[in-house]
Amino acid sequence: MIEGLVSIIMPSYNAARFIGESINSVLLQTYSNWELLIVDDCSKDNSVEVVRKFANIDKRVVLFSLEKNVGAAAARNVAIEHAQGQYIAFLDSDDVWDEYKLEKQLAFMKQYSYVFTFSNYYVMEENGKKTENIVKVPSSLSYHQYLRNTICLLYTS
C-alpha cells in the first residue's frame, strides 16, 4: 500500500465512445496522487487502443486486458488485486468526474475520519450532456437501510 495514493478502478467493455472522456476527467484531477487501473473485458471495439494512447502518455494509467469476458464485477476485482493505493475509488468507463472530486472527497474523509464515502451525482444523457437530475446521498442511513440500499454498490460517479 502506498500512503495517500488513490487507486481508481475502471472496468471497460466496448467503451471506446466514452472512455477517453472518462480518462480525461481523471487526468484533470487537482489531486494528482492516483493510479488508474483499467480492466478491458474483451471489448470488440477499439477501447483498448484508446486506453493505450493514454497509458503511453501517462504511466499512472495502467491497462489490463482479460482473455475471457467475465463481467464488470469480476473485472473490478482484477483491478483491486493490482491496486497499490491507500484508497480505492470506482469510476465506470462512461462516467466523468468533476476536476475537484478526489481532492474534495479525500479532504472530507480526513476531516471526519471516514473510511468510506460516496457522493451525489448528476445523471447524464447519452450525448454527454449533464441533466438537472441529481441523485442525492441520504442525510442518514441506518445499518439495515444500508443493507437494503444498493446506491453504494451500483453507482460509481
Task: Annotate the PLM regions.
Residues M1-S157:
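Nucleotide-sugar donor-binding/catalytic module of glycosyltransferases
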